[in-house]
Amino acid sequence: MSTICLNMIVKNEASIIVDTLTNILANIHIDYWVIADTGSDDGTQSVIQTFFQQRGIPGELLQHEWKNFGHNRELALQGAQGKTDYVFFFDADDRFEGTLALPEQLTATIYNFYLTNMVRTTRYPRRLLVKNDGSCEWVGVLHEVITAKNAATSNETYVEGDYHVISGRFGARNQNPNKYLDDAHMLEEAYAQEQNQALKRRYAYYCGQSYRDCNEPALAAEWYERNIELCSKTGEEVRFSLIALGSEYRKLNDSAKTLEAWWNAYNAAPQHAEALGLIAEYLYVLERYSLGLEVAKKATTLPDPLPHATLFVNEPVHRYVIWYELGRHAVKLSLCDDAYASAKHLLNQIEHSDALNNFILSILEALKGHIERDTFANGKQIQHRIAAMQQLQTDDTRTKHQGMLNWFMQTFVSAPPQ
């Protein structure tokens, strides 16, 4: 069985670090630990040492002066080198959720784990487990990444399973009210000094993200544009950057540039439906229903993206938004078949909200004739899904819900005669 060293950098995480380490040990067998503290004054160091002493797990606490994320993660990695077969990275405010099952014998150079945000809407891979033989290194001052020193001789894979790591925002760094502005300034400086084009592109993108997060859409758009200039014309990086760019132009009320960015995002990766979902939603706001319907219909024909082949998967867009937009545009255009298809699809998804349930019920209430003309089995399935609805917070939704159940009781009393 491959041995694993836990490798972290921490500062002032005394209030959460026990929960963090407990969560890790519940999911990963840790044989050794090397954690670097970068200047805690809240007793984080002693909390960590006591935690591992009580569990009989050997390890080392290092003290490093803070410079930047890539530099300090690399120092911590060097401190762990050779202590085990593999090294596992984790942030103090991240948490495993679900059931993780690592292979007993690890062989790849790099293992990606699947992460999600705190509201569980976006899924993406991150490299968290690598060979502990000096074959990998950290790069980047912020939003750093672990990379193989020799890509030709390394291999990378993904840890599949019914789990994810929730990327938290409750650690000490996130208590800084100027975090995103500080990050943007650091990334601007790094961009100006960096000669490596891949890192320069990465800094530009995350600088845009930081300005987005401190509500500076004009500056965010400027940095996304710089990032896009350095990207290839097709693929995931430019697709996601163009989606982000369009969102900032929308905040600036520039509809032409918003749609241009999102159309370019779709053209950069035409197998991906996310940009089309955003376009369809915006066309509804602009009251361009015919075009919006065609865009939404196209989006519904595209496959769900594979998490390991996509930078970030916006799951609600694929599960709900494109079908919701199909339904909204169809209602405006009085296209009953499309509206009915939308409602049936949405009804078969995990419940999202009272508002979406209200929308589904409104369509089905108006299209009872479609239900009657559908197969008996489909009609009963619709009845069962409506009966199972839980998110019924408003009086209007509850009234529609009860009305549909009463109608079903009168209409679908028993199976049709054979």
Give a label for each model feature.
Residues 12-28, 32:
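Short, well-formed alpha-helical segments that are part of the catalytic scaffolds
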Residues 18, 42-51, 99:
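Acidic helix N-cap motif at the loop->helix transition within catalytic regions
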Residues 23, 36-48, 65-66:
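A conserved acidic beta->alpha catalytic loop
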Residues 71-77, 94-222, 232:
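Catalytic-site signature of metal-activated, phosphate-bearing donor transferases
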Residues 74-86:
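Active-site nucleotide-sugar/metal-binding loop of Leloir-type enzymes
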Residues 206, 244, 278-281, 285, ...:
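"A position-specific structural signal for the A-helix of alpha-solenoid helical repeats
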